[in-house]
């Protein structure tokens, strides 16, 4: 590094030293010109010396002025000259020497201009002395300037050299430190490589030792297996001989056993067949006796059941007849009582209904459904224009099941002679205490007659009671055959007539909805079938009232 920098720095110093030689040559030329101008003695004519004397007096002043201008130009040139300070070596030449080198050119130009004038006059001793003094001053100033510049250049060069040496030392120290770090890293790497090589050597030695042991083991196993194979083959030969002997003996035993079995099997088969046949005959006789006893017992029970069924059917018919008679008596009594009660109000009812009919006209029938289905109506029996209603899912007795078809047939026969008006039934509800305490259902009926006058209604409550306590023993058997317990009694209660009646109710009572016989018979059939299959106490009847 340092040698390369010296190679690059030496040519610069040599190039800078070249202006020194040019400066010295310029100074020498300037001295020669000054000496030439000072020594030259011009040829002066004697006649013209006096006339030109006053001019000669003026010449030294001109020379002196020119010399002073030269000195001033020399002194001012270091300040005005451009500096090219780029290197410490160039400071000396750029400050004063280059300025001094430029001054002779200017002086030469001035001297050339005044060469003719100066050459025409004589140089006196005083002028020479002044010239000498000026030259001494100039030379001494030049000397001091050169020495000072050289000393400055020397000091600058020393400082620059020190700085360069310091930089080189720092670079050298950093490079040396880097090399030391690399050496330490290489040493550590060498140690790790040595350790790894040692481990590899150990692994190689252990593997070679293990391989040797494995080879020895393989040789031992080979010899052992060869011996074992020979031993197994010898044992196999012995075992095969034993198996052959055993097989031969077993075949002989099988032949002997087959001969003995063929002889013994015939006798044993006959004995077993006789024993099995005797046992089967005994079992068959015992089973036939048991089944005959069971058939006789079941046939007796069947005869008893048939007799019981016939007896209960006779009882059922008897109770149905009595129920029909009692029901018809109660209905007739209710009709007579109602007719006598409402006989006084016939005229008033007819007038009121006629007036309402004229006011509403044919729109009254459209209001029937609203009056029938109005839930805000007071709890009084409302006539509902509907076909024959089937009973709700409640218990219906045997007597009530027969009463419904009779009422339906009575309605159909009366409809042919009368106005064919069907009596609607409105179910208001039953008491909760009656359903919890005893098995009684109360179904109030609203009965209207098509042949009666308007405003005549009959309200009746029919209650049916059945006594299940005496029939608990046979209730389960009778339920299977579809026979319901008989009704014990029918109670017909009388109620006070309803005097408060709305206009739609009165209109519905006067003009009830007609029903075809087919729908009434189908409804009665469905009601009869349902009451026959469900053990219910509640029944819905359609009653036709005759005047």
Curated annotation (Swiss-Prot):
It comes from Macaca fascicularis. Residues 1-27, 347-383, 509-547 are annotated as: Disordered. It comes from the Eukaryota. Disulfide bonds: none annotated. Essential for the assembly of the distal half of centrioles, required for centriole elongation. Acts as a negative regulator of centriole elongation. This is Centrosomal protein POC5. Residues 163-189, 288-327 form a coiled coil. Its main location: cytoplasm. Keywords: Acetylation, Cell cycle, Coiled coil, Cytoplasm, Cytoskeleton, Phosphoprotein, Repeat. Hyperphosphorylated during recruitment to procentrioles in G2/M phase. The lineage of its organism: Eukaryota, Metazoa, Chordata, Craniata, Vertebrata. Centrin-binding (CBR) repeats lie at residues 114-145, 203-234, 235-267. It is found in: Cytoplasm, Cytoskeleton, Microtubule organizing center, Centrosome; Cytoplasm, Cytoskeleton, Microtubule organizing center, Centrosome, Centriole. Interacts with CETN2 and CETN3. Forms a microtubule-associated complex with POC1B, CETN2 and FAM161A. Interacts with CCDC15. The modification Phosphoserine is found at residues 81, 536. GO terms for cellular component: centriole; centrosome; cytoplasm; photoreceptor connecting cilium. One of its GO terms (biological process) is centriole elongation. Residues 517-547 have a biased composition (Polar residues). Residues 354-372 have a biased composition (Basic and acidic residues). Belongs to the POC5 family. The modification N6-acetyllysine is found at residue 510.
């Amino acid at each position: 590094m340092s040698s390369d920098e010296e190679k690059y720095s030496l040519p610069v110093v040599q190039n800078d030293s070249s202006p020194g030689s040019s400066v010295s040559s310029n100074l020498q030329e300037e001295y020669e010109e000054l000496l030439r101008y000072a020594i030259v003695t011009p040829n002066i004519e004697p006649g013209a010396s006096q006339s030109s004397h006053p001019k000669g007096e003026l010449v030294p002043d001109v020379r002196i002025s020119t010399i002073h201008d030269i000195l001033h130009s020399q002194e001012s040139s270091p300040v005005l000259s451009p500096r090219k300070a780029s290197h410490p070596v160039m400071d000396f030449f750029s400050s004063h020497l280059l300025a001094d080198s430029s001054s002779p050119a200017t002086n030469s130009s001035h001297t050339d201009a005044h060469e003719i004038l100066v050459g025409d006059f004589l140089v006196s001793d005083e002028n020479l002395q002044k010239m000498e003094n000026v030259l001494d001053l100039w030379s001494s100033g030049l000397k001091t300037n050169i020495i000072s510049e050289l000393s400055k250049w020397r000091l600058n060069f020393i400082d620059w050299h020190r700085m360069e040496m310091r930089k080189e030392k720092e670079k050298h120290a950093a490079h040396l430190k880097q090399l030391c770090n690399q050496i330490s890293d290489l040493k550590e790497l060498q140690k790790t490589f040595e350790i790894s090589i040692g481990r590899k050597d150990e692994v190689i030695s252990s593997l070679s030792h293990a391989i040797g042991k494995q080879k020895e083991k393989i040789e031992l196993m080979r010899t052992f297996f060869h011996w074992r194979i020979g031993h197994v083959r010898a044992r196999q030969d012995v075992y095969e001989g034993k198996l052959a002997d055993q097989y031969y003996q077993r075949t002989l035993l099988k032949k002997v056993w087959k001969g003995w079995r063929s002889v013994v099997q015939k006798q044993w088969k006959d004995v077993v067949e006789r024993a099995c046949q005797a046992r089967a005959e005994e079992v068959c006789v015992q089973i036939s006796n048991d089944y005959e006893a069971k058939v006789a017992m079941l046939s007796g029970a069947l005869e008893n059941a048939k007799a019981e069924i016939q007896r209960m059917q006779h009882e059922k018919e008897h109770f149905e007849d009595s129920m029909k008679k009692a029901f018809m008596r109660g209905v007739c009594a209710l009709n007579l009582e109602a007719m006598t009660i409402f006989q006084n109000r016939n005229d008033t009812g007819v007038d009121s209904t006629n007036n309402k009919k004229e006011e509403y006209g044919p729109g009254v029938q459209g209001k029937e459904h609203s009056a029938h289905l109005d839930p805000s109506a007071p709890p009084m029996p409302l006539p509902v224009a509907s076909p024959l209603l089937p009973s709700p899912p409640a218990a219906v007795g045997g007597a009530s099941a027969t009463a419904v078809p009779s009422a339906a047939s009575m309605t159909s026969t009366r409809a042919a002679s009368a106005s064919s008006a069907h009596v609607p039934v409105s179910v208001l509800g039953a008491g909760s205490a009656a359903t919890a305490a005893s098995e009684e259902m109360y179904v109030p009926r609203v009965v209207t007659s098509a042949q009666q006058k308007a405003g005549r209604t009959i309200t009746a409550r029919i209650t049916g009671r059945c006594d299940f306590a005496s029939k608990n023993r046979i209730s389960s058997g009778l339920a299977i055959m579809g026979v319901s317990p008989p009704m014990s009694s029918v109670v017909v209660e009388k109620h006070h007539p309803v005097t408060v009646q709305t206009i739609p109710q009165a209109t519905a009572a006067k003009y009830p909805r007609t029903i075809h016989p087919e729908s009434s018979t189908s409804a009665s059939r469905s009601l009869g079938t349902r009451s026959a299959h469900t053990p219910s106490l509640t029944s819905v009847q359609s009653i036709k009232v005759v005047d």
